[in-house]
């Protein structure tokens, strides 16, 4: 079998006046993530992991942050389009594991909703999607609450190969 592993990463600055959307879930908080789209750091990292595993480049190659078509875009829509492109390249998604690093807010109450959204968008059973939340132990820009980071890994298998 032809297995492919992809790794994804994203980080966005926390700012006032923006909603906080992570894993397709709106999270009550006084600040949100700054970005061209909805700035869903988790879905962007997963999208990058999937494109990377299929050797299709990265999220910026497919959904440029200079393209007005993606201004304010729902990252769940972008993730579903990524899935379609990965499948068109002949791959099946096996699983995704991800980590969100945020000093605040606490994400644990939202993890299961994030997993459900991601599983639905990937067309996978829930047990093949994992989301973890960590703090940065008050270290660096993440520890000071200046931003939120996400990392993801994805496993694909080439169909018919």
UniProtKB/Swiss-Prot annotation:
Binds 1 divalent metal cation per subunit. PROSITE patterns: ISPF (PS01350). GO terms for biological process: isopentenyl diphosphate biosynthetic process, methylerythritol 4-phosphate pathway; terpenoid biosynthetic process. Keywords: Isoprene biosynthesis, Lyase, Metal-binding. The record marks 36, 135 as: Transition state stabilizer. CDD domains: MECDP_synthase (cd00554). It holds the Pfam family YgbB. InterPro entries: MECDP_synthase, MECDP_synthase_CS, MECDP_synthase_sf. Signal peptide: none annotated. GO terms for molecular function: 2-C-methyl-D-erythritol 2,4-cyclodiphosphate synthase activity; metal ion binding. It catalyses: 4-CDP-2-C-methyl-D-erythritol 2-phosphate = 2-C-methyl-D-erythritol 2,4-cyclic diphosphate + CMP. A divalent metal cation binds at residues 10, 12, 44. Pathway: Isoprenoid biosynthesis; isopentenyl diphosphate biosynthesis via DXP pathway; isopentenyl diphosphate from 1-deoxy-D-xylulose 5-phosphate: step 4/6. Belongs to the IspF family. Homotrimer. Involved in the biosynthesis of isopentenyl diphosphate (IPP) and dimethylallyl diphosphate (DMAPP), two major building blocks of isoprenoid compounds. Catalyzes the conversion of 4-diphosphocytidyl-2-C-methyl-D-erythritol 2-phosphate (CDP-ME2P) to 2-C-methyl-D-erythritol 2,4-cyclodiphosphate (ME-CPP) with a corresponding release of cytidine 5-monophosphate (CMP). This is 2-C-methyl-D-erythritol 2,4-cyclodiphosphate synthase. It comes from Burkholderia multivorans (strain ATCC 17616 / 249).
